[in-house]
């Protein structure tokens, strides 16, 4: 999920992705190759194993790590995410509560989409079962969820049509591939 979202948003925003070494190296060398229902192309964006100092003032941080890694990710980037907008785009329940211990600006997100690894820095999107959903945790939608507009601006297609997206309350389910990401407008 993380590298795919970073790739799609790199066309409309400045993006840095924090990824495992093999993926970060591959993205730096040849970009991320994406195929499937969201289109085909090679995407180039900033990617490394850690968050460079220049990226610590991002508009949004998107966490797509496995639920079991949420607290470790939050601890690793605690100084960067404190007081910042943090989007939880992860499998599992309870991620928003964990993130909420590190920032009071948590956005829950849900995406029911199948992302398939086709090699290092190569992803195939084969299924989209529902629109992406975003919502302020724990209260639902508010005007600060401008990330919804940023996500809508990313050129994500579903069978040749723009993907749909809704902003609503707390997320109970979503899908991820164990990477940490963030988006900057």
Predicted regions and their residues:
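NAD(P)+-binding Rossmann beta1-loop-alpha1 motif at the extreme N-terminus of oxidoreductases
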Residues: 1-36
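Active-site-adjacent beta-strand anchor residues
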Residues: 17-20, 63-64, 88-89, 137
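Rossmann-like NAD(P)(H) cofactor-binding subdomain of soluble oxidoreductases
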Residues: 39-123
């Amino acid at each position: 999920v993380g590298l795919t979202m970073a790739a799609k948003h790199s066309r409309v925003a400045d993006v840095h992705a924090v990824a495992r070494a093999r993926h970060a190296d591959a993205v730096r060398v040849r970009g991320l190759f994406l195929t499937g229902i969201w289109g085909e192309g090679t995407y180039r964006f900033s990617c490394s194993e850690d968050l460079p100092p220049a990226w610590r003032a991002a508009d949004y941080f998107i966490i797509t790590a496995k639920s079991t890694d949420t607290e470790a990710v939050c601890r690793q980037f605690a100084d960067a995410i404190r007081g910042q907008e943090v989007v939880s785009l992860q499998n599992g329940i309870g991620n928003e509560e964990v993130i909420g211990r590190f920032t009071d600006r948590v956005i829950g997100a849900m995406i029911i989409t199948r992302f398939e690894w086709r090699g290092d820095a190569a992803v195939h999107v084969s299924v989209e079962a529902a629109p992406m959903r975003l919502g302020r945790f724990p209260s639902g939608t508010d005007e600060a969820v401008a990330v919804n507009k940023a996500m809508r601006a990313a050129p994500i297609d579903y069978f040749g049509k723009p993907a749909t997206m809704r902003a609503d309350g707390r997320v109970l389910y979503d899908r991820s591939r164990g990477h940490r990401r963030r988006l900057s407008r």
